[in-house]
Structure formats: C-alpha cells, structure tokens
C-alpha cells in the first residue's frame, strides 16, 4: 500500500480543514447577502465542456479512463455556465449563482512526470447582464468578500485589471502569425521576444510603450485615450475605476490597469482581473475572474442571455497567506469520561450521552484506568480539559 499521497495531492490536518471551512463560510455569507444562490456543479464533466470551446488546453485537464471522454474540472465556470443554459435556462435574468468545491489541475513536474494539483475554490457567476453593469456589481461584491478576509498591510493586496478589447486595439496593425507572436510576447512581458521579431522601429517602440503602460488606472486610461481616441472599452473602464477607487482605498488595495494582462485560461472576452497578495515567499493570486460571454454562447445562450461574468477565490492559498491572522476556533471545552476497575465501558458510554444531551463535547477513555490520577494524566493527550471520573 502506498503511504504517500499522489503527486500534487495534500493531506490536510484538522486545523487546516477548520480554517478552510471558516473562510468558505465567511465568503458564502457575503454571497447570500448579495442575493446569490448556491449550486453544486459536478466534479466529473465531459471533456468538451471542460475545454470551454478551446479556451482551456487539454494538458490542463485531468482525464479519466472511461467509455466516453471525461475529466476532472480544472475550474467551475464552464460547468456552471452549462447548467445556467440548460437546467436553469427558464430562470429569470439576472441569474446569480455561487459555488464552492474542489478543482483539479494537471501540470508537468520539473522531472517531467504528471502532477495533479487539488485546490479548494469558492466563487460567484452572474448571467444575463451586459457590460458595464454586471462588472460594477461583480467588483463591488469582490471588495465586500475581500473585506471579510481581513487582509493586512503586509500582504500588499493589488487588483490587477485588464480588458481583451485593449489587447485587440494594440494588435490592430498586425496580422496572422506575427499577431500571435506579438501577443504572446506582450502577455509574458518578454522584451527579447519582441526584439527577435525585427519589427520596424516605430512599431517596436510603440509596442514597448504598451509593455510599460501599466500602473494607476486613470493615468493609464488617459494615455490610452491619447493613442486610440474615444473607445467604449475605455469609457467603461473609466466608469468602473471611478466606482472601485474609494472601495479599494478603504481596504488598502492598490489598483493597477495593464492593457497587456491576459490570464492563463483564455475564457475571457472582456474585463479580466486578478487579486494578488504578497506572501512571505512570493506573490500569490488569491482571486481571479472576468467576463466570458463567448463561453455562455457556446453553451447555447442567445442574445442578452449570452452574457456572463464571475470570479473565484483560491481558499487553500488564502489559508496559507492568513495563517498568522486567522486562527482556528478557540479550543472547545471537552470532557474526558474515564472509568476505573469498578465501572464499565457501558457506564461510561451512558455518561457520555448525558453530556451530549447538554450540548457538551465529551469523549470516552475506552480502556479502564488504574485510578483517578491515571485518568487525569491522560487529559492532555486526549485533548480534553475536564475529567468525569466513574469508579462504581
């Protein structure tokens, strides 16, 4: 029998499980306050659904051996979008849903072997609302949810925002393969890759300008307006940041607009964002989301119903980030019911039921103790604070 978990999998101890539950419950309370209903998408889906119309690469999905192509979900948005367009099709829009559960991501380890990463996720999806109203609610909800996490200044939280329309504007002068190479270089902030393309000097300098055009949102928008003129995407972002700025300031969250920012999964067709915090070792992404209208359309939605936005929190990463700030519940007083040679286990179990009826946590010492002192010495090992001694 293998004594180690599979590569990428983790055994969580009781405290880690409790902290995950506490974080999930905090977020769930916020979702409910905002009128979101809980759903539970399946862990196993058809590969066609999980790939989200090509937005998620096959190598990111853990495949199952089955009669039909199946896999474990690498995220929950595609499954919830499918449900919204089928089982929940007749429900009125806006359709507000939230879910929490485990996701599974496949990656290649340094030595070349397959590694499966298992993570707990919690998030919301909002269907049937066009820009920019949906984004206004979504990011306002994000800030409300983040507030319950009680991030501190040492985490240096930063909300990085992009928009696929901004990348489209940058890519307008370029065609075909060159367009994709430039896009990849910009996304990865790879100046050397841009140089290797041997572009005309004016185009190269303009791309370098875009590469460095990131920072305070309103300043960046002003620079982009000077380059591209009046654009609906810029107007929407202007309105959105005017709404977000005071919310972010209240929580000490830095806002950053980056026209070249694009996430790993190519789900998004509009606003994209991720919330980054500084851990003791390195930056960590604790939330991400955006607009994914194309995905909803692929699920069969038409017209206004083909609209969706959402975000998700990475619970395990948040737990590790907040280990010093958030603690497990104060130790619950636990009674150890112990018995001596003159009593029996049956008596102890009956006594335990007495405590349980009063709502008191109690455990039974399953072997008889020599005397009261022997029973008392076992309190610490059993995680108990009081002793109920039976000797007759």
Curated annotation (Swiss-Prot):
It is found in: Cytoplasm. GO terms for molecular function: histidine-tRNA ligase activity. PROSITE patterns: AA_TRNA_LIGASE_II. It comes from the Bacteria. Pfam families: tRNA-synt_His (PF13393). The keyword Cytoplasm applies. Keywords: Amino-acid biosynthesis, Cytoplasm, Histidine biosynthesis. Gene3D superfamilies: Bira Bifunctional Protein, Domain 2. GO terms for cellular component: cytoplasm. GO terms for biological process: histidyl-tRNA aminoacylation; L-histidine biosynthetic process. The keyword Cytoplasm applies. Pathway: Amino-acid biosynthesis; L-histidine biosynthesis; L-histidine from 5-phospho-alpha-D-ribose 1-diphosphate: step 1/9. SUPFAM superfamilies: Class II aaRS and biotin synthetases. Heteromultimer composed of HisG and HisZ subunits. Required for the first step of histidine biosynthesis. May allow the feedback regulation of ATP phosphoribosyltransferase activity by histidine. NCBIfam families: PRK12292.2-1. This function is generally fulfilled by the C-terminal part of HisG, which is missing in some bacteria such as this one. Belongs to the class-II aminoacyl-tRNA synthetase family. HisZ subfamily. This is ATP phosphoribosyltransferase regulatory subunit. The gene is hisZ.
């Amino acid at each position: 029998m293998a004594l180690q978990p599979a590569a990428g999998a983790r055994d969580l101890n009781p405290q880690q499980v409790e902290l995950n539950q506490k974080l999930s419950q905090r977020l769930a309370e916020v979702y409910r306050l905002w009128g979101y209903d809980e759903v539970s998408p399946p862990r196993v889906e058809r590969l066609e659904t999980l790939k989200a119309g090509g937005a998620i690469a096959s190598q990111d999905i853990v495949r199952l051996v089955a009669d039909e192509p199946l896999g474990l979900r690498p995220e929950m948005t595609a499954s919830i979008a499918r449900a919204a367009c089928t089982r929940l099709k007749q429900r009125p829009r806006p359709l507000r849903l939230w879910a929490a559960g485990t996701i599974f991501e496949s990656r290649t380890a340094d030595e070349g072997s397959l590694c499966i990463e298992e993570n707990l996720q919690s998030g919301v999806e909002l269907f049937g609302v066009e820009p920019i109203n949906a984004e206004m609610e979504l990011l306002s909800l994000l800030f409300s949810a983040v507030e319950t996490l009680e991030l501190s200044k040492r985490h240096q939280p930063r909300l990085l925002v992009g928009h696929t329309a901004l990348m489209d504007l940058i890519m307008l002068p370029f065609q075909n393969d060159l367009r994709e190479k430039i896009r990849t270089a910009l996304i990865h902030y790879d100046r050397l890759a841009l140089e290797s393309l041997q572009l005309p000097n004016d185009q190269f300098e303009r791309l370098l300008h875009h590469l460095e055009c990131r920072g305070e949102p309103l300043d960046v928008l002003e620079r982009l307006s000077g380059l591209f003129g009046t654009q609906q995407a810029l107007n929407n972002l202007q309105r959105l940041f005017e709404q977000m700025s005071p919310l972010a300031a209240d929580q000490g969250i830095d806002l950053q607009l980056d026209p070249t920012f694009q996430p790993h999964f190519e789900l998004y067709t509009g606003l994209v964002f991720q919330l980054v915090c500084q851990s003791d070792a390195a930056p960590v992404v604790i939330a991400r989301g955006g607009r994914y209208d194309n995905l909803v359309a692929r699920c069969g939605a038409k017209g206004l119903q083909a609209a969706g936005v959402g975000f998700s929190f990475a619970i395990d990463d948040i737990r590790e980030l907040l280990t010093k700030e958030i603690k497990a519940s104060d130790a619950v007083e636990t009674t150890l019911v112990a018995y001596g040679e003159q009593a029996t286990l049956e008596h102890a179990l009956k006594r335990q039921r007495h405590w349980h009826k009063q709502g008191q946590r109690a455990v039974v010492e399953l072997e008889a103790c020599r005397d009261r002192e022997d029973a008392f010495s076992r309190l610490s090992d059993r995680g108990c604070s009081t002793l109920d001694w039976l000797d007759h």
